[in-house]
Amino acid sequence: MIRKIPSFIEVYKSLIQIPTISSNNKLLDQSNKNFIDLLSNYFSDLNFSVKNYQIPHTDKYNMLACVGSGNGGLLLSGHSDTVDFDEKKWTKDPFKLTETNNKFYGLGAVDMKGFFALILEVISSINIKKINKPIYILATANEETDMSGAKNFIQSTIIKPDCIIIGEPTSLKLINAHKGHMSYSIKVIGDTGHSSNPDHGVNSIEIMHDVIRSLLILKKYFKEEYQHPNFSIPYPTMNLSSIHGGSAINRICPLCILNFEIRPIPGLTLTQIEIVIKEKLETIMKKWSHRIFIKKLFSSVPAYECPHNSGTIKIVEKLCQLNSAAVNYCTEAPFLQRIAPTLILGPGSIEQAHQPDEYLEHYFIQPTKNIITKLINKFCY
């Protein structure tokens, strides 16, 4: 096949140099349109049909590229956005791909713009005219915040591939399950007053003490009632993350705020957790209904699992000579899993993601290309 796009390195450089930061801080959040436009052009040059979809009420976009027709096939998926960064902690330019010591440095180098560069490198070297089933490439928006890109995609798409591979950095280990994530903030409003007469007002810290006691009972309940042997920590976890209250030693505390998170295992739904939280806090909430307020901090992510008896897992395990495993971090898999069996498999280590001087090690390049080629050959030819 005659190459129609720049070299792997040139493509990789061009993807890194476009900022695509997603952040809940509006001052840091950026559109990914320029990145999506560039990626779309690359796939168009390789004879893919490309459609870009704007996420409603945002300046963020998804891209779906396709070559071939019919049912089934393979979907290779990744997110276009990165986290923000602390410039003081970086020793290299985050938006310039730097190759040194057998590593590629740059913001998004491993999480996960390198995966797109590798897909393009493989596609540019194979004869796509002979495929029997479609190859899909999905680039999503806002994975690093609310995952609205993946959520929007599954609501609108009609495609039904045989297999979805998300190229998150797994050190090329095959992942078929991960925990979910829920985060909450509880605010307790008390009374202000002089500490010389502490019974003259309601102390928010004292109410929060009862709230925490109820949450710790819930934490124990999760640990005792729910187990999944494939996880290194085999039960749902709860972490009381931060607590703030009070302003002076001689003042009744008028406000106390507690933030906490829960990481559910597969089999424990977000709805179940919400119901149990309400049950455990019901008594104290009724007693102090006008003083206790609870809200979600961020969009929740369900736990995910592609069952071991799935034919897709068996095919990919045999094809790549890998055994599937479970991890504790979150991806878009629970959403994409709703349209087709989904697995997570990609180059680089998760330990380098979201870190200063983020990098992808060079030795992942050829094995990743080999795996992508095998997947395309298996599901599309």
UniProtKB/Swiss-Prot annotation:
Listed cofactors: Zn(2+); Co(2+); glutathione
Compartment(s) of residence: Cytoplasm
Cofactor binding note from Swiss-Prot or TrEMBL: Binds 2 Zn(2+) or Co(2+) ions per subunit.
GO molecular function, one term: acetylornithine deacetylase activity
Gene Ontology cellular component list: cytoplasm
Active site annotation, chain numbering: 81, 143
Domain of life: Bacteria
GO biological process, one term: L-arginine biosynthetic process
Keyword Amino-acid biosynthesis carried by entry: yes
Top-level class of the enzyme under EC nomenclature: hydrolase
Quaternary structure, from the entry: Homodimer.
HAMAP family in alphabetical order: ArgE
Known function: Catalyzes the hydrolysis of the amide bond of N(2)-acetylated L-amino acids. Cleaves the acetyl group from N-acetyl-L-ornithine to form L-ornithine, an intermediate in L-arginine biosynthesis pathway, and a branchpoint in the synthesis of polyamines.
Protein name: Acetylornithine deacetylase
Lineage, top ranks: Bacteria, Pseudomonadati, Pseudomonadota, Gammaproteobacteria, Enterobacterales
